[in-house]
Design a protein with these regions (language model features):
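"…together with the soluble PPM/PP2C metallo-phosphatase catalytic core" -> "…together
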Residues: 2-168
Length: 168
């Protein structure tokens, strides 16, 4: 148990400090290349660099890889691959105008590592009903939950940085 607590503290610290270090570097990099957009939440012509999620992504991946070194199991590997695929979909969606169907369908395919690596348990334990095995329903839930979660996080980011507090 103590080993898991130490790993959690280290992984959390790596995520925090990676984002803390990379965000100013990313801001300068994006501003030099004039990759800025008007901030719709501020009065005047305040420009902000975009896409800023790259530093959050780097922090998440750094922490997930560190976690994998502590606990080399297929579930963590599936999360790493799913995160990379999901980020790729987000970058494509930000950079190119795609149809409304693109993001949900692409994010559904991002669930493939979870399914292919068997990073799930289709047995559910209910206090009142006991153990229930629902493999087909669980597979469908995994495929639908990745796009739902991705679009929900994207939707709640109505103010700059709200989603970053949700994800870290």
């Amino acid at each position: 148990m103590e080993e898991k607590i130490i790993a959690a503290i280290i992984v959390s610290a790596i995520a925090f400090f990676t984002i803390y270090v990379f965000t100013p570097i990313l801001i300068k990099f994006l501003e030099k290349r004039n990759l800025t957009v008007k901030d719709a939440n501020k009065i005047g012509n305040v420009m902000i660099p975009r896409p800023g999620g790259i530093s959050i992504f780097i922090g998440i991946i750094a922490s997930e890889i560190t976690l994998y070194f502590f606990f080399p199991i297929s579930e963590i590997l599936a999360i790493i691959i799913t995160s990379i695929l999901g980020f790729s979909v987000g970058i494509i969606d930000d950079r190119k105008v795609m149809g409304g169907w693109f993001k949900p369908v692409a994010l559904a395919f991002c669930a493939a590592p979870i399914l292919l690596l068997g990073a799930y348990d289709s047995n559910l334990d209910f206090p009142l009903f006991g153990s229930v095995s629902i493999p087909s329903l669980y597979l469908a839930l995994v495929v639908f939950m990745i796009p739902i979660t991705g679009n929900t996080i994207n939707s709640i980011d109505v103010l700059n940085g709200v989603a970053s507090g949700f994800t870290t």
